[in-house]
Design a protein with these regions (language model features):
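Conserved SF2 helicase motif VI
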Residues: 431-447
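Conserved helicase ATPase core of P-loop NTP-dependent helicases/translocases
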Residues: 382-407
Length: 490
């Protein structure tokens, strides 16, 4: 294979240069931090409901069937089981159901309930749980709830990692205490630091809340949740009990899946027992979306026109990768994504959509896509807001009709943007969970509109089309899979 187009070589060299410069910067920072005094013991915020910015949600109907009936069932399950997994669609009131369940538990206990809430940082910053609990307390003044703390997975991990603050947290939760885990799928890897830290609190009953508990590696996902439920003490313990260790492949995954994604139960019959165990912790009620006053969603799949220059540039990138000009497969895949998202036809279509809607949400993955979109918006005199990893959600102007750029990883979950009538999935990415979470940012109860439009932009190139199709089928794609796709479809 040869390439007369120098695009791939130029990009590979530019990435290598940037990495060298960043490496030097990191080395200097590391050098200057050598004599930094270690951090003190993490502080647990125990006065979370006194925040003056808390505003009780006024749209929650605590008497509707979805909230009261499901909340009662969840509360009973939480009392009887070490682990309960509540699965409900994004925006359908999972938080309200969970809070109602806590209220029912408190009635059963006959005294103030001890519980903590773990939620993504954007949810904590946005006071989502605070506002829901405050709304419950206003509706039920004789049965008010007061969480011991509301914290993030990262902060909880730091607290548990320190022996003194770990003991303080255990004492704070107390006997018969409960742990509420929002966006439970953040703990789907049983060997991650956050999961291992949470395992140290396995003596407490837990409620995990998510719309997307299982990915295409459902066995590992279920393993993680069952460890939280006390069915297994660790991943190794699960592998020993189930006999699945002999199916481990070179990447550490389990080679027990058929071509259609189903588990090969003939080779690994233990899967039936695992399913029975998972059903014991799972509660996935049917939800009448119409009764929740949620908007209808109209989806638009936008197949973009062919761009011969883009296709040529992608082939040039592939040539550079085969010549090993990229330091890693990650660098190559990012370069491919960046070229696709900088396609002028894609950017022009984006502008046409943005001009038709109020507060359109524009989802992107990599910073290069963000920069390309911002440049195009500025070119057309369109102001914008940005939600990325460093954004304080309180700074977002919810009343503005300007488009909001949202990074999938930073803002796909636990953010409510109820004035928006449009979502544009500008950049296709590799996670089905991120896609589902992104869809729910403006499809929620008590919206300002009865109809929300979702746009999916797909370039006329095999790689982008395959990426869209596989993620929409529910797959979570690793770099190894993406590399195979790039080899086949570019």
């Amino acid at each position: 294979m040869s390439s007369k187009n120098p695009y791939g070589i130029i990009v590979a060299r530019a990435i290598a240069k940037r990495k060298r410069e960043r490496g030097l910067e990191k080395a200097e920072k590391k050098k200057s931090k050598k004599n930094v005094i270690p951090k003190n013991k993490p502080v647990i915020d125990v006065d979370v409901m006194s925040n003056p910015k808390i505003k009780p949600y006024d749209y929650i109907d605590w008497s509707d069937a979805s909230t009261s009936k499901n909340g009662t069932v969840v509360g009973e399950r939480m009392r009887e089981s070490q682990m309960t997994l509540l699965k409900m669609p994004t925006g359908s009131g999972k938080t309200a159901v969970s809070v109602y369940a806590l209220g029912e538990l408190q009635k059963k206990h006959g005294k103030p309930l001890s519980f903590i809430v773990i939620a993504p940082s954007k949810t904590v910053e946005g006071l989502g749980w605070h506002n829901t609990i405050a709304a419950y307390n206003r509706a039920f003044p004789d049965n008010q709830l007061y969480p011991k703390t509301i914290t993030t997975p990262g902060k909880l991990s730091n607290i548990i990692a320190h022996p003194t603050s770990q003991l303080e947290m255990i004492k704070l939760i107390g006997n018969n205490g409960y742990i509420i885990i929002d966006e439970l799928h953040l703990y789907k890897n049983p060997t991650s630091k956050r999961s291992k830290m949470l395992h140290k609190l396995n003596m407490f009953h837990k409620l995990g809340v998510t719309a997307t508990p299982l990915t295409n590696d459902r066995v590992l996902d279920m393993c993680s949740y069952l460890i939280l439920g006390g069915y297994y003490s660790s991943k190794n313990n699960f592998e020993d009990k189930s006999g699945i260790k002999s199916f481990k492949n070179e990447f550490g995954g389990y080679g027990i899946y058929l071509f259609d994604g189903n588990v090969n139960t003939f080779a690994w019959p233990y899967y039936f027992q695992m399913l029975d165990e998972f059903k014991e912790i799972l509660y996935a009620p049917s939800v009448d979306i119409k009764s929740l006053d949620m908007p209808d969603v109209e989806s638009h799949i936008i197949q973009l026109e062919e761009n011969e220059q883009m296709l040529s540039d992608l082939k040039s990138l592939k040539y550079a990768q085969r010549k090993r000009m990229f330091d890693s497969i990650t660098d190559y895949l990012i370069a491919v994504a960046n070229r696709i998202t900088r396609d002028e036809k894609r950017l022009d279509k984006l502008i046409k959509i943005v001009k038709k809607h109020k507060q359109p949400l524009i989802f992107y993955r990599y910073n290069d896509a963000r920069d390309a979109v911002i440049e195009k918006l500025n070119e057309h005199g369109i102001s914008h807001q940005l939600i990325s990893g460093n954004t304080n959600f309180e700074e977002i102007d919810h009343s503005s009709t300007a488009p909001i750029l949202i990074q999938y990883q930073a803002g796909a979950a636990s953010i409510e943007l109820k004035n928006s009538d449009c979502t544009i999935f500008y950049e296709n990415q590799s996670s089905h969970i991120s896609l589902i979470q992104g869809r729910g940012r403006n499809v929620r109860r008590a919206m300002e509109t009865d109809l929300v439009h979702h746009y999916y932009l797909i370039s006329d190139c095999g790689f982008d089309q395959e990426l869209y199709e596989r993620v929409h089928r529910g797959e979570e794609l690793s770099n190894e899979i993406l590399e195979e796709m790039a080899e086949e479809f570019i």
